[in-house]
Amino acid sequence: DQLGIHSRTIDITPAVDGYLQYEPDADGRRRGNVMARMRMIVLFDLSAKLNALPVGTGNKTERLFGYFTWHADDSPPINPLGDLFKTQVWQLARYLGVPEVIVSKPASADLIVGQTDEDDLGISYHLADQILYFLLRGYRVEQIEEMGYPREKILLVKARLESTHWKRHLPTTAMLSTTSINDYYLRPVDY
């Protein structure tokens, strides 16, 4: 409302609970993933109704950390913030005049009461973005540590970056023919 943008709130609780009643032992991570996927079902359905496309809000930091639910918040076909670190998204929001109450709200998927991204990740976005910046440019752990960054945080970021690499790719397809549709697929116009 503060931005003058039409919005609609849809309670996904009945749909989520309808499934989770059959999985009473689901932990918080699984429950959060179910909620994120249900939210994406609603967004894609409404986009079909409106003849529109869902717009993603994920950022580079979340993608590099693998901090998203596969086939949920990583699904929108348009993601204008996807190549911006989280701290850059905040800078852009302030530049565009987004109300401070929105910009300064602790980052959260808003699926579990009291949950915050930084608590889940074990590092602040400010520190994570700086470390990611150097890792992506080929700096070694020792070089980043010499700049004054805590070794345990560098190793945490590096481990997340490496262990979630698979989440940033399309599913692997077994190549059984010369026309297999996977990472190497060439459309006829590409030949």
What are the functions of these language-model segments?
Residues T116-Y191:
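Peripheral terminal appendages
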